[in-house]
Amino acid sequence: RMNKTSKLHMTTDEFRKQGYKVIDWLADYYEKIEEFPVLSQVKPGEIRAKLPEYAPENGRSYNDILNDMDLMMPGMTHWQSPNFHAFFPCASSGPAILADMIATGTGIVGMLWETSPSCTEVETHVLDWLVDMMGMPNKFKSSSKGGGVIQDTASSSTLISLIGAREYASNGEFNSINDSTKLTAYVSSQSHSSIEKAIKVAGLGKDSMRFIDVDEKFAMIPSKLKERITQDIADGFTPAFVCATVGTTNTTAMDPIDEIGKICKEYNIWLHVDAAMAGAAALCPEFRYLQDGLDYANSYTFNPHKWMLTNFDCSVLFVDDRKKITSAMSVVPEYLKNK
């Protein structure tokens, strides 16, 4: 372990010394970030060619390692530059960076309450705060049947929601009978590609996916959704999952959650709301109308790492009934049991 006399690890004195240098390096980086070209200035393989072919037999001083960052700089795309407008927003901040150091430095594995009560309870409580801050229905709070959890990305949040929907639609029999041929999922033609991947990973198969037409603003057309659902039911399929998007990646289109939600309620279909891109806008009361209809949602995800100055990766998933997820996902051996 790290201590004042360690011969196998960095000593605590050396850790302090090098830590100051890292903070200085980062502070200097942010002070001059606008001077760098936003996009990387290298060709494929150019950075790797500067690295040793084999791992060194002996370690190097931390000073040398930090100096190597100067070699890496031409190969960096500067996501934190104010001139960066590609892909999606992903802004960090000083408090987030320092908090990440504490989280990494304490080395806690907060996979359940027993492994770190503080980690679990703070996570749960802060996500309850988010429900209030964003004006979301109270059913997403841990004090109700629902609750929230931090995930790495909205892709994994969607996968978890889809598995919950799969088991809900099949009355928990999907894993037993392994028959995906009758379950169907519905998304707009503008939905994120991760949903199609989730459908494949969850075992439904790509043929179960229904792409619903969009209007001139690239939002899902509810009447087209209902038409396809009724046709599938007539053909012997079981509609299991509908995904509405708040801010598509291509065009930031907003699907009409309220109208879609009413259809899902009528046919008892799981409604997942993917607000990864624009959900954080609900922190401002004047934009909450974009999420009207969340009362109908069974699950909801958005990414604080996009607009909330939080380090990547931080996605949050809220569900209206956590037992629908735990019953679908839980495997609890002795070493993972809480008191």
PLM features: what roles do these ranges have?
Residues M2-K145:
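N-terminal entrance/gating region of PLP-dependent enzymes' catalytic architecture
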Residues E123, L127, S143-I177, S194-A198:
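Conserved beta-loop-alpha segment that forms the PLP phosphate-binding cup at the N-terminus of a helix
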Residues I160-I163, E196-K200, T252-P256, A281-F287, ...:
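Short acidic, glycine/serine/threonine-rich loops at helix termini
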Residues N175-F241, T251-M254, E259, Y289:
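PLP-dependent aminotransferase-class I/II
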Residues M220, E227, E266, M277-A278, ...:
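Acidic/histidine-rich catalytic neighborhood
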Residues A253-P285:
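Catalytic PLP-binding core of fold-type I/II PLP enzymes
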Residues G293-K339:
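Active-site C-terminal subdomain of aminotransferase-like
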